[in-house]
């Protein structure tokens, strides 16, 4: 079972802005928004592989550039 982020407020220290900020941080940390954007449209497996390969190439080139500068 997946635990979803949630923020509980007491009547004593009810500060909506702080609670909202805390909730947004938990949602971002859980990766819910990025997962939702990823699943918003169907992506063919071939397109996913192509994107993954391009990202790996980009990381490799970045690593090479970083090594050349140092």
UniProtKB/Swiss-Prot annotation:
GO molecular function list: structural constituent of ribosome
Taxonomy, superkingdom: Bacteria
Gene Ontology biological-process entries: translation
Keyword rRNA-binding (UniProt): no
Keywords, ordered alphabetically: Ribonucleoprotein, Ribosomal protein
Entry's Gene Ontology cellular component terms: ribonucleoprotein complex; ribosome
Family: Belongs to the bacterial ribosomal protein bS21 family.
Protein's recorded name: Small ribosomal subunit protein bS21
Species: Nitratidesulfovibrio vulgaris (strain ATCC 29579 / DSM 644 / CCUG 34227 / NCIMB 8303 / VKM B-1760 / Hildenborough)
Name of the gene: rpsU
């Amino acid at each position: 079972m997946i635990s979803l982020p949630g923020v509980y407020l007491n009547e004593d220290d009810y500060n909506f802005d702080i609670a909202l900020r805390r909730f947004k941080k938990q949602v971002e940390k859980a990766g819910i928004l990025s997962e939702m954007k990823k699943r918003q449209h169907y992506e063919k497996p071939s397109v996913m592989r192509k994107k993954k390969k391009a990202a790996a190439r980009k990381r490799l080139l970045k690593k090479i550039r970083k090594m050349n500068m140092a």
